[in-house]
Amino acid sequence: MACGLVASNLNLKPGECLRVRGEVAADAKSFSLNLGKDDNNLCLHFNPRFNAHGDINTIVCNSKDGGAWGAEQRETAFPFQPGSVAEVCISFNQTDLTIKLPDGYEFKFPNRLNLEAINYLSAGGDFKIKCVAFE
C-alpha cells in the first residue's frame, strides 16, 4: 500500500486524542492509518477494507512489534463510503486504544506494545488527509 503522509516526533500522550479527517477515494479499495513508535513498531495498524485482501467492508486492525505483525482483529462496523469525507478519532492509554468511527461507533484495540507515547503516524491507500488535529 503506497504511503502518503508520514509524521514523526508527535509525542501524543495517554488520554490525548488524534483526529484525522480526509477524503475517501471514489474507487477506494482500502486505506490505512498507522500509529506507533516508528514504521516497525506500530501499536495500531487501522485498515478499512472496502474490497481488498479477501475482506469486504471490514476494518482490520493489527500491531507490529520489531517488524513482526501480531494477530489481526476484525470489526464489521463499517461507516465508510467511497467518495465521502470521513473522520476518525484515536486515543490511547497503557492497556488499549479507542477508535471512534465517523458514525460515533467506538471500539478498542489492545496496546500490545505498551507504548507511553505515540510518536509516529503514517497514512496510505485510498484516503487523502485533509486535517490532523491533537486534542
From Swiss-Prot:
Lineage: Eukaryota, Metazoa, Chordata, Craniata, Vertebrata
Residues with PTM N6-succinyllysine: K108
Major location (coarse): secreted
Protein's organism: Ovis aries
Gene3D superfamilies given in the database record: 2.60.120.200
Galectin domain span: 4-135
N6-acetyllysine carried by residues: K13, K29, K108, K128
Record gene name: LGALS1
PTM-bearing positions, type N-acetylalanine: A2
Alphabetical keyword list: Acetylation, Apoptosis, Cytoplasm, Extracellular matrix, Lectin, Phosphoprotein, Secreted
Name assigned to this protein: Galectin-1
